Amino acid sequence: CACLVGSEMCIRDRDMGVPAATEFLDTITPQYIADLITWGAIGARTTESQVHRELASGLSMPVGFKNGTSGSLQIAVDAIVSSSCPHCFLSVTKQGVSAIVSTTGNKSCHLILRGSSLGPNFDEEHVKEAVAALQKSGINNRIMIDCSHGNSCKDYRKQPAVAANIAEQISNGSDQVVAVMIESNIVEGAQPLSSDLVYGKSITDQCIGWETTEEVLETLAAAVRRRRAKRQEA
């Protein structure tokens, strides 16, 4: 089954020392794979969903909530606040038996800026606006930025430019941005699902290729080194 295949993949990643992350889409699957996941995401279209907020409240990992597709930050802020509190919801036990699950709340949830139908929101001005909204609600003000989706205007080739802007913010001393999300694969682009697939090429969203990914990661790493050097000088 799909859960078994996913678990086997996560175990292989773990054995190589690579932490696994995923987007959680329902309240059942996590019971089978959550112990193998290091970080989780709730997508823009489900951030407003009460059951996903309840789910996040019981996950033993940091969970990122994306801003809404309309650009609304408040939807994600409300989700983070809600998920920090205890909840009860219908799910299954680890043995697959239907049960009422009780949670203690997840204080490690955070915001993901992913852009919107109105345009990108990765620049310094939008980051400051997001931090202010998070601080006003008294919650974690550290932010992840999605280099794809609305922030790339759905053009995967623009992801390096988005990452370069984020790197500049980091180089200038910003510590609000703690992570980025990149749609990346071995081979750039995407392909339709067929019987003749190219290994390492996405069958969903278009991705940057591995060489470009390495360049983006080095740009971000260099920015972190510059920020660290500035702090040591101060």
Model-derived features: where do they sit?
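Single conserved hydrophobic/aromatic residue that forms the stacking wall/gate
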Residues: 1-6, 10-11
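Glycine-rich tight-turn/loop motif centered on a GG-T
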Residues: 7, 34-48, 80-89, 106, ...
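Catalytic-site microenvironment of enzymes
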Residues: 8, 33-37, 52, 132-136
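A structural motif corresponding to the C-terminal end of an alpha-helix
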Residues: 12-18, 58-59, 106, 133-140, ...
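Hydrophobic faces of well-ordered beta-strands that scaffold small-molecule active sites
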Residues: 20-23, 63-65, 109-113, 141-146, ...
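Loop-centered beta-sheet repeat module
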Residues: 41-93
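Conserved mixed alpha/beta catalytic, RNA-binding, or beta-rich assembly cores of soluble enzyme
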Residues: 78-165
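Catalytic-face loop-and-helix region of soluble metabolic enzyme cores
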Residues: 116, 144-203, 207-211, 215, ...
